[in-house]
Each structure stands twice: as structure tokens, then as C-alpha cells.
Amino acid sequence: NRINKPHRQDLYDRLSSLTCGNISLQSAGHELKYPGLDFVTYDRHYDNLSNLLSIKRNFQTSMFSLVTESQYEERFGIITEKTLNAIVAGHPFIVAGHQGCLDDIKGLGFKTYPTIFNEEYQYFENDERIDAMLDLNGAYFTRITTTALHDLVDEHRDIIDYNRDYFFDSFGPDRLEWLRTQLLNIWE
């Protein structure tokens, strides 16, 4: 997360009191190189590939991702590289994002993890969504053992593999076809 936003800070503050795992505001303890750049500077100087490679180890040394998406309070949000990185890394994920964010991820063709995470939090209003996410899911993950976490990931290997395969094999062509259809519908 390149930019600290209120929902990210709120989630960080709440998770910091827990005694599990590596809780950090910026990608598993690493401040990213270029925080808060304006678009012109970002466009000229920011290196997304270097940034992605700099957090590779974080994905390799963790079992699931709690993604803080770019949009939280917006009525209609987008799904960004943050969620897609978790998918490519083979992580089950939970997302602190806009209302209905998990439904939007499913709408893109991916699967989520309702047998791991209680996903009802996504329907709560902005000021209640993070509370609901933590209330519905937090206690379990503060008590789970490393062995049980490995077993949980193994039990969901079919979804992990589906998401990764879908991302590499179909996601781009599906999005391109969707865009073509939208453009044709506009000009009919």
C-alpha cells in the first residue's frame, strides 16, 4: 500500500493489539520506496515491477493475505493489483475494501473463501465494515496454529489453483471481451 488511507490506518491500529503474525501498515513491514506520489512523478519514476519484487518475500513467508484495497468509502470501488497479487501468490484472502468488494471479485470470475472467512462483513456500512470483518473473523485467526493454518490452505488448494490459473489463462481475455461488449452496446 503506497498511500496511507484512513481505513488502512484504522485496520492497522486494531490489528496492532493482536499478538499474531507480522502486522504492519505497509506491505508486511516494508515501507515502499515512493509513498504518496503525484501522478506525474509516479508516471515518470515509479517502478511497479521493482515494487512488486520487493514484497515477494512477504508473500512467500505468509499463508494468507488481508488486503486493504485502494477504495473503501466509495460506493463503487475497483479491485486493484493488491488483490491480484494475493491471487497470484496463491493466498487465500480477505479484503478491506468498498461495500460488496468480495462480490465484485467474484464478478470478475475469481472465487473467494467463504469456508475460511465469514464474508458478510462486506455488506456493512463504511463505519462498521472493518469492525464487522474483525468481529466475524479475528478471533479464529488469533488462535489458529501454524499446522492448522497449513492444513486450511491445503484444504482450499482447489480454489487457490483455480484463481491462479484463471488469472493467467482467462482473466485478460475475459476482461477484453467484456470491454468490447460494453463499447458495442454504447454505439448500437
Predicted regions and their residues:
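Pol beta-like nucleotidyltransferase catalytic core
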Residues: 1-67, 73-188
